[in-house]
Amino acid sequence: MSAYDKVMAARSKDRPTSKDYIKNIFTNFTEFHGDRRFGDDNAVVAGIGLLGNRPVTVIALEKGQDTKERLSRNFGSAHPEGYRKALRQMKLAEKFNRPVVCFIDTSGAYCGIGAEERGQGQAIAENLITMIDLKVPIISILIGEGGSGGALALAVADEVWMLENAIYSVISPEGCASILWKDSARVKEVAECLKLTADDLYSLGVTDMVIKENGGDFIRVYEDLSNKILHSINKYYEFSADKLVKMRFEKYQRLGMITQ
């Protein structure tokens, strides 16, 4: 598949959304609502579930599964209150020593006037600052689209995984073609240049694992993820909180480093 083919696959309406992953990986999931500052944002699903016998804080960007739900969830484009809801759950996870698992599927944070007035940039920045210093394990998984800061706001983690047909980029191919080359017809060429596929980002060291989709057999994907998440969480609990934070900080320090 070309890079643009993967862009279209990541956006497919038939692709499982975050709710499917939560339902098939965790049991007894209880959702929490609101940011205690403005309101609730349906684009972000956050709560606690069990992975085996271990309580886990789960935070997910949810696009919705039909037209009505997609509208209610703003197509997965979160407002500031969504990111602040996520932040609230991260802090609770740290307080109660629960690991955090994030599922990311968004074209980007919502960029409307109301979102800007309520501090969209600040909300994303606060998440980045908090996640780099959070004293519990964090696993972030890109399951579809990973668009710009809206995705990054849940992707500062000990490990970042991508499904093989997911994408992760600072800008969409359409946006890049229009802004840089003033030619939307070059979108396929731009998709290759952006290096936004799972294989590209793994080879660059931006992500830590590519999750195979088994030809669309997502039941196997859920089982595979369940095992991998539990294994990784248990691995990181072998380290002290200070060591965990130090390793995470060093991981992001290495991004973009050039070695001779």
Swiss-Prot record:
Catalyzed reactions: N(6)-carboxybiotinyl-L-lysyl-[protein] + acetyl-CoA = N(6)-biotinyl-L-lysyl-[protein] + malonyl-CoA
Keywords, sorted A to Z: ATP-binding, Cytoplasm, Fatty acid biosynthesis, Fatty acid metabolism, Lipid biosynthesis, Lipid metabolism, Nucleotide-binding, Transferase
Disulphide bridges, residue numbers: none
Highest rank taxon of the organism: Bacteria
Enzyme Commission designation: 2.1.3.15
Subcellular location: Cytoplasm
Gene Ontology terms: biological process: fatty acid biosynthetic process; malonyl-CoA biosynthetic process
Domain CoA carboxyltransferase C-terminal, residue spans: 1-235
Pathway: Lipid metabolism; malonyl-CoA biosynthesis; malonyl-CoA from acetyl-CoA: step 1/1
A GO molecular function held by the record: carboxyl- or carbamoyltransferase activity
Pfam families according to UniProt: ACCA (PF03255)
TM spans (from-to): none
InterPro entries in the record: Acetyl_CoA_COase_a_su (IPR001095), ClpP/crotonase-like_dom_sf (IPR029045), COA_CT_C (IPR011763)
A single Gene Ontology CC term: acetyl-CoA carboxylase complex
Class in the EC hierarchy, top level: transferase
Recorded family membership: Belongs to the AccA family.
NCBIfam families: accA, AccA_sub, PRK05724.1
Function text: Component of the acetyl coenzyme A carboxylase (ACC) complex. First, biotin carboxylase catalyzes the carboxylation of biotin on its carrier protein (BCCP) and then the CO(2) group is transferred by the carboxyltransferase to acetyl-CoA to form malonyl-CoA.
Subunit description: Acetyl-CoA carboxylase is a heterohexamer composed of biotin carboxyl carrier protein (AccB), biotin carboxylase (AccC) and two subunits each of ACCase subunit alpha (AccA) and ACCase subunit beta (AccD).
Protein name in the entry: Acetyl-coenzyme A carboxylase carboxyl transferase subunit alpha
